[in-house]
Design a protein with these regions (language model features):
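N-terminal intrinsically disordered, cationic/polar leader segments
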Residues: 1-26, 33-116
């Protein structure tokens, strides 16, 4: 199983989906693509300092929080959550960003709209 942990200023990915043979696992490929897109987008589209260590079976990304990078991190979260919903036996996502948890709680209570 792939475990994705999203925290303020960092993303960690560890494990293998086990949904296919090495090199042919579409779930691993999807998560890897999302991680690499986040890193490349943050590096090329923002002025934020970023450190990444990406290797087979895992990735660790640490970044300075800014509105631009937060939007990219939110986009990464949406994508990886979609993969986890489609393949719950292969991917687990833990969102430990306080701001995100508060926003979801407020949205459920009708106090927050993502468009605000």
């Amino acid at each position: 199983m792939i475990q994705v942990i999203i925290q303020p200023g960092s993303i960690q990915v560890a494990g293998h989906a086990g949904a296919g043979p090495p090199g042919y696992d579409l779930v691993c490929a999807a998560v890897s693509t999302l991680v690499q897109t986040f890193v490349r987008s943050a590096e090329q589209l923002t002025d934020t300092q970023l450190h990444s260590d990406i290797a087979p079976g895992g990735a660790f990304v640490r970044y300075e929080e800014s509105p631009q990078v937060q939007l990219l991190a939110d986009s990464f979260f949406v994508g990886v959550q979609g993969v986890a919903e489609a393949y719950p036996q292969c991917v687990q996502v833990l969102d430990r960003r306080e701001r995100r948890a508060e926003a979801l709680t407020a949205e459920k209570q009708g106090r927050y709209s993502p468009n605000e």
